[in-house]
Design a protein with these regions (language model features):
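Accessory structured domains or lobes within enzymes
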Residues: 29, 126, 132-199
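Sec/Tat signal peptide C-region and signal peptidase I cleavage site
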Residues: 17-23
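Positively charged n-region of N-terminal signal peptides that target proteins for export
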Residues: 1-4
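A contiguous strand-loop segment
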Residues: 23-117, 149-152
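Bacterial N-terminal signal peptides
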Residues: 6-16
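Second-shell loop/turn segments in exported
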Residues: 111-115, 123-129
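Short, basic/low-complexity N-terminal boundary segments at the transition from targeting/disordered tails
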Residues: 15, 65-78, 128-141
């Protein structure tokens, strides 16, 4: 008889437990000449592919408006983790040492294509890995492409010189933190400014 109240109490308390969080985090640990780039990935599904992307491949963005689709030829080869097919990476590392990964960011608002060539946001990630060797290059060119996507993400980018940057698209423009403005090379599912307040 005593088991029934204990069981009912246990079931009632179980309903009060918080739900699991979808909380991705990407980081770069740096010490002396060593850097380790890592990520935990909590998402609704976990299937994916490791893809080898060759240099010298001509590419066209897969957009519903082909006239605005960006075209480029990959300058660097890379290895990426893709869940949605070739050319749509969640993150990766190119042969020049540029590493990039993404996290969900609900407040993302991308730049409109306007008169610029455009890509999907996952293609934006592949474009960076295909074309740039350094964080400085990514930062200088972050706003050159329009982005057409329903996926709301932001990026942590690091290079073999141990430079890192966050790239977020807020209010239709790129917002970058690097150098002294990036005291902790880590990113989660909030803007970098919000994350700094958690310290």
């Amino acid at each position: 008889m005593r088991r029934v109240p204990v069981l009912l109490l246990t079931l009632a308390l179980t309903g009060l437990l918080p739900p699991p969080a979808d909380a991705c985090t990407t980081f770069c640990l740096r010490k002396d000449a060593t850097a380790v780039f890592g990520k935990n990935y909590d998402w609704h599904f976990d299937d994916g592919l490791v893809v080898v992307n060759k240099r010298g491949v001509t590419k066209t963005a897969a957009l519903p408006l082909p006239a605005r689709a960006a075209k480029w030829t990959s300058k660097y080869g890379s290895v990426t983790f893709n869940q949605f097919g070739r050319e749509f990476p969640n993150g990766g590392l190119n042969e020049a040492g540029l590493a990039l990964d993404l996290m969900w960011l609900e407040s993302t608002r991308y730049p409109t294509p306007a008169d610029r060539p455009a890509v999907d946001v996952l293609e934006w990630a592949q474009y960076q890995l295909d074309n740039y060797a350094t964080v400085d290059e990514v930062v200088r060119n972050a706003g050159n492409l329009g982005i057409v996507s329903d996926g709301k993400v932001h990026f942590l980018v690091c290079d073999k010189g141990r430079s890192c940057a966050t790239v977020e698209f807020l209010d239709g423009r790129p917002v970058v933190h690097t150098g002294a403005a990036l005291p902790a090379p880590a990113l989660a599912n909030h803007t970098y400014e919000e994350l700094l307040r958690f310290q």
